Design a protein with these regions (language model features):
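DNA-recognition helix of helix-turn-helix
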Residues: 73, 77, 142-166
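Arg/Lys-rich amphipathic alpha helix in sigma70-family domain 2
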Residues: 56, 63, 73-91, 103
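Hydrophobic-face residues of short alpha-helical interaction/recognition segments
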Residues: 29, 33, 68, 72-80
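Structural recognition of an alpha-helix C-terminal capping motif at a helix-to-coil junction
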Residues: 45-52, 56, 62-74, 151
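Internal acidic/polar
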Residues: 86-114, 134
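Helix-turn-helix DNA-binding module
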Residues: 115, 119, 131-148
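A short pre-motif secondary-structure segment
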Residues: 124-128
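A short, charge-rich alpha-helical start-of-domain segment used by transcription regulators
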Residues: 2-31, 41-44, 59
């Protein structure tokens, strides 16, 4: 058995605290949620709910970040199903475009096109290209196989190319 800082067989790091995870990941989670649902306020609500669910579990989560992303994705899917949420106007994404250093019209066009993708394709694109997740990590968040992730990304990129060329 390997020896760790805490002794033989013990984990070397304690579970992360709410405060540390919140400080490190809140902004990133809100951005992810906002791109999924197209509304900053709703994105903040989804992120808050994800943090609440993650840190109020009976059994603590060893690695909260994948759990938080999966929870936000599921909450977004549930919201679309339950409420029949209509797609918001592209103007709701414009504040995200101005958050970027490069900003500009090209980013706005791309974000608009991403927002108009079906939810699973949108989630796959955001996780891959904005969050830099691997196909395996995306599959875990979306609850599918890596092959499905490849298919989702392929279809999404084809759609995005066509939309951006318009």
């Amino acid at each position: 058995m390997a020896e760790f800082a805490g002794g033989v067989g013990m984990r070397s790091a304690a579970r992360p605290t709410f405060e540390s995870v919140y400080a490190e990941r809140h902004t990133q989670l809100v951005r992810y949620a906002t791109v999924l649902v197209g509304d900053r306020s709703l994105g903040e609500d989804l992120a808050q709910e994800a943090f609440l669910r993650c840190f109020s579990r009976r059994r603590p989560v060893d690695d909260p970040w994948p759990y938080l992303r999966t929870t936000v994705t599921n909450l977004a899917k549930d919201g679309f199903r339950r409420n029949g949420v209509a797609r918001r106007a592209a103007s709701l994404l414009r504040p995200l475009a101005t958050d970027s250093v490069d900003g500009g019209e090209n980013r706005t066009v791309i974000l608009d096109a991403v927002y108009h993708l079906p939810l699973r394709q949108r989630a796959a694109v955001v996780l891959r290209f904005y969050e830099d997740c691997s196909e395996r990590e995306i599959a875990q968040v979306l609850g599918c196989r890596p092959g499905t992730v490849k298919s989702l990304l392929s279809r999404a990129l084809t759609t995005l190319r066509l939309e951006v060329q318009r």
